[in-house]
């Protein structure tokens, strides 16, 4: 799989759904407008980026970045 965010992944895609509060939805919409992506694509890219960069999100919301070799 390519390490490029936004590259077409190898393998089958799955659908998920989640709820966002209005403030986060607004931030997502603003980001999508700035990037030119659809709101759905913006969310996909941001989730992929976050999961690749961070190994854990503790309850205290102090993110622990993954070590990059």
From Swiss-Prot:
Gene from which the chain derives: traY
Any single Gene Ontology cellular-component annotation: cytoplasm
Protein's name in the database: Relaxosome protein TraY
Role: Conjugative DNA transfer (CDT) is the unidirectional transfer of ssDNA plasmid from a donor to a recipient cell. It is the central mechanism by which antibiotic resistance and virulence factors are propagated in bacterial populations. Part of the relaxosome, which facilitates a site- and strand-specific cut in the origin of transfer by TraI, at the nic site. Relaxosome formation requires binding of IHF and TraY to the oriT region, which then facilitates binding of TraI.
InterPro entries (UniProt xref): TraY
Pfam family, one: TraY
Family listed: Belongs to the TraY family.
Complexes and interactors: Part of the relaxosome, a complex composed of plasmid encoded TraI, TraM, TraY and host-encoded IHF bound to the F plasmid origin of transfer (oriT).
Keywords (A to Z) from UniProt: Conjugation, Cytoplasm, DNA-binding, Plasmid
One example GO MF annotation: DNA binding
Lineage of source species: Bacteria, Pseudomonadati, Pseudomonadota, Gammaproteobacteria, Enterobacterales
Subcellular locations according to the entry: Cytoplasm
């Amino acid at each position: 799989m390519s390490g490029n965010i936004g590259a077409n992944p190898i393998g089958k895609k799955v659908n998920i759904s989640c709820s966002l509060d209005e403030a986060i939805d607004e931030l997502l919409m603003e980001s999508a407008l700035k990037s030119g992506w659809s709101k759905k694509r913006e969310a996909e890219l941001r989730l992929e980026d976050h999961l690749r960069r961070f190994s854990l999100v503790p309850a205290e919301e102090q993110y622990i970045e993954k070590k990059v070799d």
